[in-house]
Structure formats: structure tokens, C-alpha cells
Amino acid sequence: MTPTFAQAVTERTLSRRTRLCVGLDPRLGEYRDVAQLRQNTLDVLEASAPYAACVKPQLAFFEALGLPGFTLLEEVCAAARTLGLPVLLDGKRGDIGTTAAAYAQGWLGGTHAGDALTVNPFLGFQTLTPFVQAARENGGAIFVLVKTSNPDQQDLQGQGVSERIAVEIARLGDEEGLGDGDYASVGAVVGATHPGDLATFRALMPKALLLLPGLGAQGAQARDLAGAFHAGGTGALASASRAVQYARGLDVGAAREAALALRDELNGALGV
């Protein structure tokens, strides 16, 4: 039986001793042409894979390239799976009715599908339904925005809004009747830049995998993230993109070293 996204990530976390999610942000301005961008992105993926629990392509940078970007995304997904890496697409999709269903079908079950997708809940909880259904049907996962890593998130996510979303995520997880140590198909995005809130959200969503963006370039430190994890270092993924892919320009060796260093920093902070 094919493992679910949550099972695959947890297995890799334990077997490879890594809680690192490597983000891929292929920014055209960093390269002389699309061919160089393509090769460097695939090289960084391969170099960092031994130290990653999953890979997170940022869809915006692939979409900005047009058709070559979608072709590259297919290559990235295929290469990641060959390397044994689950693929978490960072698209922050969200809409109503048939549009939400189309997003879910395309990104969780279509030609360019990943194993998981970030989802925006701010049109209402009912809009999550197509994404939840698609994730469950395909053995995938969604990661719902709860408290994002950017400083101005407080404009909309303060005053109890994030906590209300967290409670809904926990409810959706409870529907799956999971056993001890298992994680649901509905996870949460909680910025690593909010270390003081991590333990609260961990307690509110005990069965949710937490995606923690902001490690590295956005200023979050591995030593501050322990509150997001369960005993043994499971239940969360700390994400770094620029800090790995562009650790020293386009130097693939530097990307490898950065991924290794971040993996070790996370393990050291968690004592695992």
C-alpha cells in the first residue's frame, strides 16, 4: 500500500534524521537564461535531497516562466519522486465552488500534481472541502494557512483568527480517526518567525503536520522551533528556500552544505 504524504514525510524524518523542507524558488533574475535556471534548480534538488524530508516548489516562480515553467515543474516533481522526496507545492490556492474543485483536481491529482498543496482558507471553511477530499482520495495532504511568516500577517490573522482556523484544522483531523503517532491529511502553515506561538498551535492541532516557513533568509532560527514538534522530533517541517538554493549565488555545493547545516541545526535544537 502506497504511504500517504504524512506517512512518507514522517518515515523520512525518522529514517533520514531530517525535519528540513527544502524550498525551490527558481527566480529568473538570478540566471542568464531559462536553461541555466532549469539545470541549477534540478542540481540543487539533487544535492539537497539527502538532507530533506520533502521539497517545496514555490509555484509562483514556475508560473512566471510560462510553459517552460510548467515543464520544469513536471521535471522537478518526477526527479523528487525518483529521489524519494515527497513534493509539497506552495501555491496558497483558495476559491469557492467549482473553482476550488478545479484547483484541487489540478494540483493534487493532475499532470502537474504534487503530493501536498498549501491552501488559503480566508474565503471560508467550506471552500476547503474540495481540497480535503482530493488530498484524502490521492493519499496527499493540504497545509492550510494559519499564521504566516510575513510581518504584516497581523493585519488579518490577529485577534483570534489564526486560533479559529487551527480549531477547524483539528476538527478535520479528528474525522480521520488516526492512531497514536499518525498525522492527518490536513496540516497547517505556521511561520517559524513566530516562535512564541508554536507550542500553542502544536497543542491546538495535535494531529496536524505543521509547515514552518521562514528558516534562514526570513530570520527564523532552528533553536527556537522546538515548540512545534512532538517528542522524537516528529510533526513539523521547517522550510528554507533562499537560504539553501542561493546560499552562495548559484553554487550547488554551497546549497548542499547549507541543507546539511540546517538539518544538523534542527536536530541539535531538538536533541535528536
Swiss-Prot record:
InterPro entries, A to Z: Aldolase_TIM (IPR013785), OMPdecase_AS (IPR018089), OMPdecase_type-2 (IPR011995), OMPdeCOase_dom (IPR001754), RibuloseP-bd_barrel (IPR011060)
Catalytic residues (positions): 92 (proton donor)
Superkingdom as given in the UniProt entry: Bacteria
Key words, A-Z: Decarboxylase, Lyase, Pyrimidine biosynthesis
Enzyme Commission number: 4.1.1.23
BP GO annotations: 'de novo' pyrimidine nucleobase biosynthetic process; 'de novo' UMP biosynthetic process
Pfam entry (one): OMPdecase
Record pathway: Pyrimidine metabolism; UMP biosynthesis via de novo pathway; UMP from orotate: step 2/2
Reactions listed under catalytic activity: orotidine 5'-phosphate + H(+) = UMP + CO2
MF GO annotations: orotidine-5'-phosphate decarboxylase activity
This protein's record includes keyword Signal: no
Gene3D superfamilies: Aldolase class I (3.20.20.70)
Family according to the record: Belongs to the OMP decarboxylase family. Type 2 subfamily.
Name of this protein: Orotidine 5'-phosphate decarboxylase
Organism encoding this protein: Deinococcus radiodurans (strain ATCC 13939 / DSM 20539 / JCM 16871 / CCUG 27074 / LMG 4051 / NBRC 15346 / NCIMB 9279 / VKM B-1422 / R1)
Gene that this sequence comes from: pyrF
